[in-house]
Swiss-Prot record:
Monomer. It comes from Nitrobacter winogradskyi (strain ATCC 25391 / DSM 10237 / CIP 104748 / NCIMB 11846 / Nb-255). Catalyzes the formation of the alpha-1,6-glucosidic linkages in glycogen by scission of a 1,4-alpha-linked oligosaccharide from growing alpha-1,4-glucan chains and the subsequent attachment of the oligosaccharide to the alpha-1,6 position. One of its GO terms (molecular function) is 1,4-alpha-glucan branching enzyme activity. This is 1,4-alpha-glucan branching enzyme GlgB. The active site is at 398 (nucleophile), 451 (proton donor). The gene is glgB.
Amino acid sequence: MTELSSEARAIVEGRHSDPFHYLGCHRETDRKVVRVYLPDASEVRLIDETGEEIILTRIHDAGLFLGDLPDRAERYRLRARYGADLVELEDPYRFPPILDDFDLYLLGEGTHQRIYDKLGAHPMAMEGVDGAGFVVLAPNARAVAVVGDFNFWDRRRHPMRVRGNGYWELFIPGARAGDRYKFAITAQDGSLLPLKSDPMAFAAEVRPNTASIIFDQARLPRPTPLAATINARGVPISIYEVHLGSWRRSDGNRWLSYRELAETLPDYVRELGFTHIELMPVNEHPFDGSWGYQPTGLYAPTSRFGSPEDFAHLIDACHREGLGLLLDWVPGHFPDDPHGLGRFDGTSLYEHANPLQGRHLDWDTLIYNYGRTEVVNFLVANALFWLDRYGIDGLRVDAVASMLYLDYSRPEGGWIPNKHGGRENLEAIEFLRRFNREVFGRFPNATTVAEESTAWPQVSRPIEFGGLGFGYKWNMGWMHDTLSYFEKDPIHRKHHHDQILFGLHYAFSENFILPLSHDEVVHGKRSILGRMPGDDWQRFANLRAYYAFMFGHPGKKLMFMGAEFGQEREWNHDHALDWHLLDQARHQGVQAVVRDLNKLYREVPALHEFDCDPAGFEWIVANDADHSVFAWMRKGASGRARCLVIANLTPTIHRDYRVRVPFTGRWREALNTDSAHYGGSNVGNDGAIETSGEIIPELVLTLPPLGVIFLVPEAA
């Protein structure tokens, strides 16, 4: 055996950053030399295009072989002996690069909108040879190799080469869709890191296994398109929030698959009148108890419920029912599981190195470094990926407040101010603006929603006017105030009248969604029904009234699964909803009132056209605290598009209650939550009522106990 050069030694020791510089075919003065590294092979032959075989010389026991390629030959294959077996294979180090110069330029700038076409693992053919191309970012690594089903998980066999800006790549002949793989990374100090999953993996193993899976994105079907106005501010938007693992389950408490869900979920949601489904995070994640909010695979739909094609099938099933599909998206933090993004290349690549910036104290997770162009590119492209490849209709961004504030949930002295000495995360602000700019730039009919729990201004206002550029914002203040009010015994509500009034002072400062989300039915808060006071009759009456109050209030609507039929228990992600409750009439009544509220909301323009515009709202009765009565007029674009909403939030019937209205004539009682159909006492106004009063028209009404009524003027 000859003494190895320093370059050959680096190959054998797995620390060469450009194995192509040594391996493969190279012209040396007057000959073409082929160097091959095949650990454990006892003999290697080179087969040129004519079929001629050339025995390569073994130059090191580690598996280095050397030989000459005839000048006439352009391509070659290898035949290697492993024990008694002869194996024909292609040499990965004879193929051209995967990334071109333009890719490298855009990646360096951090402006490559379609990194999912290049990074990760892609089945492809090079020079007529089938295989898969692998590209990964690891700028501070000494060496990176691909390990997987195609090479016995041996980190010696497929070292990658580094290109510009720290992107490593390799085409591996014979690797194919369905193969599992990971990256074996050597840090600069020579230490071997835990095998890493691919940050750009498009599929992954079911937990607790953590390997990435090669997936061909060309297999994804294109979903049925929806109307361009599906997310517009002037249309009804009523969202059903779902956790796929616990909506329903099969025998033995087994999860339903994406395809099983596609057979039932969209039809159920459409039949109840919702316009959208919002899925809690489906990105791959290791811990069931995180509900998906601690993802390790942003580009892979979780394999718990099936394949990427199966998930695309579920989206298409929603679209075929006319339902928009929103995904919860988590660009704020990620877990520090060893196979994940944390210290990916031996350094804090995706996260801040300083724990005062890089670790979230509430969740013990890592925080993305929005000051790195590669990280921002990775996240923004991920949002575009779901819209482009899967055809979803929008993204709800989780925990925006934790991104915006450097001192979020941190003690005094436990955070680092920005360059101006303030607590605003300037890099996160720019990231969110870029995210919205690029989403709406490429997908103008999509929407984005912010879960932002503070009073940060202009979250859903245009970027050019100083806003963050979101389409909508969750109205957390409305949710807290109204739940607090409705939880109180009706006898005390008159002392808290302002909790209802206050929300209208800011109801149009943003494009709001009124959220009754999963966060309100966990951690000891009880279910929505469980928070309602009184005996059983009053609890259900309060619940129906609360939902009607929500649908009559300005703002788009969101309801977490189970709330639509009065789930009694808190939500538990390990079990299905209590569907057996629908055997009881009172729960059927709750479901029926939600169905009818959705129908009314869709069909009455006054209830949705100006959801986000003060022109669509007028208080009629705001100061009757003694009776806990509220009345307001919702207005639409046309002159007679009106809907009067009246809420009596005590168990006392109020008769001869006078309310002024803009039009004389007959007003139809479009919905009454106290109807016997819903389980109420059937107190109301016989379905319609004529105005009285010659100068100022008014309605003399009977207000049902713990009830809300909707009245619309009949055609003149």
